Amino acid sequence: MKKVFSGEVYEVLPTSGGIIFSYCKDVIEEKALVGYKMITFENGRFTDIVNTIYLLTKFGNNYKSVAMQCDNYITEKSIVLPNGKVFLLSQDGTARLLGADAVSVWTGELKYRGCNATDIALYKNALWASFADCNVLLRYNLTTMREELRIGGNKSPFSKPSGLFVEGDTVMVSNAGSSKLTEVNLETYSVFDYEEFEEPVKQYVKVGDNRFVVLESGLYLI
């Protein structure tokens, strides 16, 4: 495991040839100054980028209109769907589906027993959500937004599941409580612990053959 960036990383976004991430650049009068960097795999270079590149990667072509509808576009979770629509999740559990024109077509909540969803991921025509405070994953029908399946709960294999990353027919769950990556097969629903770290795992992404985790101390290549 190799540390590639030291400090508080907010979010990592995969690109076709690397990753983009947002991070805490400085704290001034108790307010965080956010910076953005891009790593290009071909040459290994780190490049400072402007927030418009970050927003385009996160929200798609209509990023300006989408970002204006977010209370905080750094903490907002998003999925750009194949049809150009954008699904958004706020920290308070508010969820919205925006059309390709960034006009809201559905608004609701992703909550389970009073717990707010912490991350979302797309698999086929289903939306998966993690609930860190309840140690569960829920599957929703993306058309009806009805809950279809639950994994976890009592004697849960998860411990504060904070991040989701779909890879093939599996989803990698980042557990901030147990400091483990847990793999869930989305066809058989089998679960096993994939890897353990010395710090809480906030996020996992894989781009090509490169796997990254965000820990409290920074961004790592594993």
What kind of feature is each model-predicted range?
Residues 21-26, 80-81, 88-92, 129-135, ...:
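Conserved beta-strand positions in repeat-built beta-propeller and related beta-rich domains
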